[in-house]
Amino acid sequence: VLTEAGLAPRFTEAAEKGEIKVRDATCPAIHTALQAAEKGVPYMPIGGVIGSDLIAGRPDWKVVDDLLIVPALRPDVALFHARWADEAGNVWVGRRRELATVAHASRQTLVTYEELKKGDMLEEELLATGVISTVYISATAHAPKGAWPLGVAGVYAPDDMHLSQYARAAKTREGFQRYLEEWVLTPRKSFSPA
């Protein structure tokens, strides 16, 4: 979903044409599957999904004693953008603790960040609870405005006009290709989005 711009047209078309496989799930079920991988167990139970029509389309999910059993979800690579990384290689995600779960569950975690903080954020009491340890981070790269056209809380807001521009361009494969050539594939010496 592209905020106010609606659904992501290229993803939607690829799913409709069967070019990518989409498996329906709930956020709690996905989080539980990631927690199973994080803990190194093959599956984990979750309550509250029983009775959902999603279960019929998920042969990998099992119901046992009124609990849904979901298999571990272990991503090959997690990619995300954070506000801060530090000199020790730790990454601050604040209250976005689901990112810590994803990092713990993944085989590799690659993070771009807005600003480098001196020292070790795990030693700063006010920041430590929102930090993912370098143990779970494979690599970081400084990328100011790296979330653009999306936003970073407390740093910059989403660029809704550009997201709308992308959504219009991405309605066709040709428009999407032109967008990629202009905004993604063309090297820039500097970048200063609105």
Question: Residue spans of the language-model regions?
Answer:
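Conserved alpha/beta enzyme-core scaffold
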Residues: 1-194
